[in-house]
Regions:
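Conserved ASCE/P-loop NTPase catalytic core
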Residues: 1-103, 107-115
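Phosphate-sensing "switch" segment of ASCE/P-loop ATPases
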Residues: 4-5, 76, 85-86, 92-105, ...
Length: 254
């Protein structure tokens, strides 16, 4: 009995099993604090999909402090090449290795006009609006057009296959490089593409300087961020070509 009691006093309690990590690619309704919790386990980043971006923009002004913190968190994630430390009483501390998430959603044209005017009239714009790289602004159509078609099952199947490949393929097998063993892989422009990019970037720079001379500071900021937009679109199109089977691996895989 003495030996048994001694064993019970010194034996360690079994460790609780580690909670499995859920792969997340999309989020909808989440605070910036919860987005941070999700990002710490999402090395590939996530996409915040908003049915109405107007609600997101309005939330920044609902409570001064909370809105300011959320706006700052959104702004900081734009580059997509950094990390982020969170230290909060009650929430503890954690580390986000890949501090990146994109915003995508719909907004009424009238709200776009309002947001643009606010950015233009603000003397200390923080560049939030300019970080929305693409806007689709519909033309007003008075005529009625009925659209009632069955979905194309072949296209839907191909879309699923391409999406799965994008989530699972190894970019290094298709020519992507790494600076360090733990760094994210990257692609380089071909010589022809690099020449075309430099010509475009030179013209972009001229337009940016013209906007600065005319004191069109919001427009200037938007033009300056087009460098990232073109690189991002090039990468997206290239990876879609890979996922569609139009680009083969750089070497044979056994």
């Amino acid at each position: 009995n003495t030996k048994k009691a001694k064993f019970n006093d010194t034996a360690e309690e079994p460790k609780a099993p580690r909670k499995p990590k859920r792969k997340r690619f999309l989020i909808n309704d989440a605070t910036h604090e919860m987005i941070g919790e999700i990002l710490k386990d999402a090395d590939q980043g996530v996409i915040a999909l908003h049915d109405e971006l107007g609600g997101l923009l309005a939330s920044f002004g609902s409570q001064a402090r909370a809105g300011s913190e959320a706006r700052s968190f959104y702004l900081g994630s734009w580059n997509g090449d950094g990390s982020y430390h969170v230290d909060r009483i009650g929430r503890g501390s954690f580390f986000i290795k890949n501090y990146w998430f994109a915003r995508f959603g719909g907004i009424k044209p009238s709200l776009i006009d309002k947001v643009v005017q606010q950015a233009i009239n603000c003397d200390h714009s923080d560049g939030f609006l300019e970080r929305f790289q693409l806007f689709s602004y519909p033309e007003f159509c008075e005529e009625y057009h009925e659209c009632n078609k069955f979905e194309d099952k072949d296209i839907k199947k191909k879309y699923g296959e391409v999406s799965h490949t994008l989530l699972t393929f190894d970019p290094t097998l298709f020519g992507a490089k790494k600076d360090f063993n733990d760094s994210r892989p990257f692609f380089r422009y071909s010589k022809e593409a690099q020449i075309a990019y430099r010509e475009w970037d030179r013209a972009r720079h001229v337009r940016q300087m013209e906007a600065r001379r005319n004191k069109q500071y919001v427009f200037e900021s938007s033009i300056s961020k087009q460098k990232v937009l073109i690189g991002s679109l090039s990468l997206i199109f290239h990876e879609f070509e890979i996922a569609s089977g139009n680009i083969t691996p750089s070497f044979n895989i056994d």
